[in-house]
From Swiss-Prot:
Residues 149-176, 232-264 are annotated as: Disordered. This is Transcription initiation factor TFIID subunit 9. Pfam families: TFIID-31kDa. GO terms for cellular component: MLL1 complex; nucleoplasm; nucleus; pre-snoRNP complex; SAGA complex; transcription factor TFIID complex; transcription factor TFTC complex. The lineage of its organism: Eukaryota, Metazoa, Chordata, Craniata, Vertebrata. The keyword Iron does not apply. The gene is TAF9. It comes from Homo sapiens (Human). Residues 151-176, 232-243 have a biased composition (Polar residues). Residues 120-137 bind DNA. The keyword Transmembrane helix does not apply.
Length: 264
C-alpha cells in the first residue's frame, strides 16, 4: 500500500485532489493510486445518472428548467434502487438460529458415497424386466380326461350279412361338470366293449378296452359326443350260429333225399 501523500498535490488534477481530500476526511490514509481513478469514474457515472433522471422528472412536470426538487427526487429514487444497506445483525442471527434448529438427516450405517435419500437421487433404474413366459407344448403327449360321468349308452347294431363284418356305431353322451378349455389338446378315453359268453374260441375276440382319440374342436362346453367303429362280438356269434343252423338244415335235407332214394 502506498500513501496518498507520495504524489505531489500540484501535479494531480483538481478532481483527484478533491477525491483525496474526501478520503482523508473519512480517515482513509493508505490506498493505491488507482483507487482515486476508480472513485472519479464512479462519481462521474453517478452524477450523470442523477442529472438525467432529474431532467426526465422536470419534463414530466412540464417545467422549463431543472430545479433542486427534481434533483432530490432523482437522488431518492436512485438510492432506493442502487444503495441498499445489509440487514441488521440481530435479524441475521435469528434466521440462523431457526435454521440450525432443523436436525440433519441420519448418516447411513453402511459405507459408500454419502448420497441424499433415494427419492432425491437419479440412480434408480428407469426400466422394468419382462419375464419370459414359457409356452406349454401341446404335442408332448396325450392327456387323459378327468371326471367324465357317462350319462347313457345307446347301441344301434345294423343288420349283419354273411362273409363281411359289420361295424357297430355307439354314441356316448357325457356331461362335464365344469367348463374346460381343451383347445389344441388331444386326450384318450378308454371304453370297455361288451362281450357275449356265447363267443367260441375259434372266433378272434376283440380287445377288451379300445382307445378313442377325441378332437378338441368338436367338444362343446357341456356335452361330449364320442363316435367309434368297433367289431361286435355278439354279431359275430349270431352270424356263426346262423351258419351252423343252415348247415344242419342242409345236412338234414340231404339225409331225407337219400332215404327217399333208397325207398324207391
Amino acid at each position: 500500500m502506498e500513501s496518498g501523500k507520495t504524489a505531489s498535490p500540484k501535479s494531480m488534477p483538481k478532481d483527484a485532489q478533491m477525491m483525496a481530500q474526501i478520503l482523508k476526511d473519512m480517515g482513509i490514509t493508505e490506498y493505491e493510486p488507482r483507487v482515486i481513478n476508480q472513485m472519479l469514474e464512479f462519481a462521474f457515472r453517478y452524477v450523470t445518472t442523477i442529472l438525467d433522471d432529474a431532467k426526465i422528472y422536470s419534463s414530466h412536470a412540464k417545467k422549463a428548467t431543472v430545479d433542486a426538487d427534481d434533483v432530490r427526487l432523482a437522488i431518492q429514487c436512485r438510492a432506493d434502487q442502487s444503495f441498499t444497506s445489509p440487514p441488521p445483525r440481530d435479524f441475521l442471527l435469528d434466521i440462523a438460529r431457526q435454521r440450525n434448529q432443523t436436525p440433519l438427516p441420519l448418516i447411513k450405517p453402511y459405507s459408500g458415497p454419502r448420497l441424499p435419500p433415494d427419492r432425491y437421487c437419479l440412480t434408480a433404474p428407469n426400466y422394468r424386466l419382462k419375464s419370459l413366459q414359457k409356452k406349454a407344448s401341446t404335442s408332448a403327449g396325450r392327456i387323459t380326461v378327468p371326471r367324465l360321468s357317462v350319462g347313457s349308452v345307446t347301441s344301434r347294431p345294423s343288420t349283419p350279412t354273411l362273409g363281411t363284418p359289420t361295424p357297430q356305431t355307439m354314441s356316448v353322451s357325457t356331461k362335464v361338470g365344469t367348463p374346460m378349455s381343451l383347445t389344441g389338446q388331444r386326450f384318450t378315453v378308454q371304453m370297455p366293449t361288451s362281450q357275449s359268453p356265447a363267443v367260441k374260441a375259434s372266433i378272434p375276440a376283440t380287445s377288451a378296452v379300445q382307445n378313442v382319440l377325441i378332437n378338441p374342436s368338436l367338444i362343446g362346453s357341456k356335452n361330449i359326443l364320442i363316435t367309434t367303429n368297433m367289431m361286435s362280438s355278439q354279431n359275430t356269434a349270431n352270424e356263426s350260429s346262423n351258419a351252423l343252423k343252415r348247415k344242419r338244415e342242409d345236412d338234414d335235407d340231404d339225409d331225407d333225399d337219400d332215404d327217399d332214394y333208397d325207398n324207391l
